[in-house]
Amino acid sequence: IKTVVEGKMPSVYFLTGHGEKTIDENYKTFKSNLKNYNYDAKELNLTTESEVPEDAAIIVVPAPKTDFTDAETEKIERYMDKGGNLSLLLSPNDEKIIYKNIEKIMHQYGIGMDYNRVYETDSSKHVSGNKYEMMVNLVDLSQISDESAKEGLTDLTSELLQNDSIIPYMPASRSFYQYNAENASTLNICPLIETNETAYGENYGGN
C-alpha cells in the first residue's frame, strides 16, 4: 500500500564494513524475494553515513566478522529508539573476538549470544557427513500467545511459519538465549527457530 500511495519502496539495508556477506554474492534469491514483497535492497556503511537513512524499513547484518564501532552502535541505537528494525545474522566465528557492541544492543532487548557452534548428534536430522547443517523447527505461529508479538512479524515471516511444506535446514549456527533485562516488562521475546533436543553446542571463537 505504501508503495502504491507514495510511489516509493521501503528499503532493506544490508550493513557492510565488517566482512559481512553481500546481497549480490550471497543473497541473490533473498534480494529477489524482497522485491516481490515491494522492498528495495541496498547496502549501508555506517562508518561513512552520518545516520541510518530515513527510508530504512530494517537493517540486516549478515554474518559480521568484526564488531561495530562505538559510533556505529550509537547510530543504530538512535535508529532503534525511533522504532527501527534490526536483523542480526550472527554466524559462528572461530576468531578470538568478542562482539561487545553488538551484544550491548542485543542485551537491551533481553537476548544473549553464545560463542559456540551448534551441531546435531542424530544423523537422520543433519546433512550426510555434515553435523553442522541440521534440521531445525520453525515455531508454530499458533503457539505464539502474545498477540502483539504476532503483529510484529512481517508478512513474509508469518507466511514461512505457516508453511507446513517447508523442512528447514540451518547451516553454521550459534545459539542464543533469553534473560530478564531491566526493561523485560516492556519486551515481547519470541523464538522463531529451534533445534531438536539432540542438538548441542561446542565452544567456538570468543575469548
Task: Map each language-model feature to its residues.
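Short boundary motifs at domain starts and secondary-structure transition points
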Residues: 1-8, 50, 181-182
